[in-house]
Amino acid sequence: MKVLLQSVPRYDRTELPQVTKHLPCNPSIAFHGGRLLCAYRGCNYDLREGHFQFFYGSGPSRLPDSQSYIAEIGSDLACKSVDFIEDRHLRATPEFADGVEDVRLVPFRGRLLALASGVNFQPVLKQKRLIGDSKMILAELKDRKLHLIRSFDSRNPVEKTGMPVLGREQLDLVYSVSPFLLI
């Protein structure tokens, strides 16, 4: 007789720390340099409540804000360390004035690349739009800093992070806005 419980898969989980008041979400996991790494986002709103009430510090805010983190995960799935992903140099440009969000880790040819959405929410304030501008970017994540390789302009007002497709020493990126477009 076979006991069914022995054939049931086992699930483990890890908890990503809330570094500031921003709530953790959107993890991306990659194995690179002999380490299990996890990039994740901290956002200033709670998606679980069914509405978007933005906050910044101790008060309400009119705009969303993101922080990006990089964590190292141990073999026991415990979070060994966490730190900010540096994007202030990108925030200093008009194109990405509000930073990056939804970082996706892509180990490729010995480098740790990152796909992300670079955002600017000024159109929300100036043009009374509901959503800001965003562009997909490709960067190298090195020493916790995003080093921009290039941004992609598909002429869509909103771009969310694409999905990497690795094959035959080539890296293709699939746009989520248009999943049949490879770049």
Label each residue range with its predicted role.
Residues M1-H22, F31-E95, P107-K160, V165-I183:
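Beta-rich carbohydrate-recognition and catalytic domains
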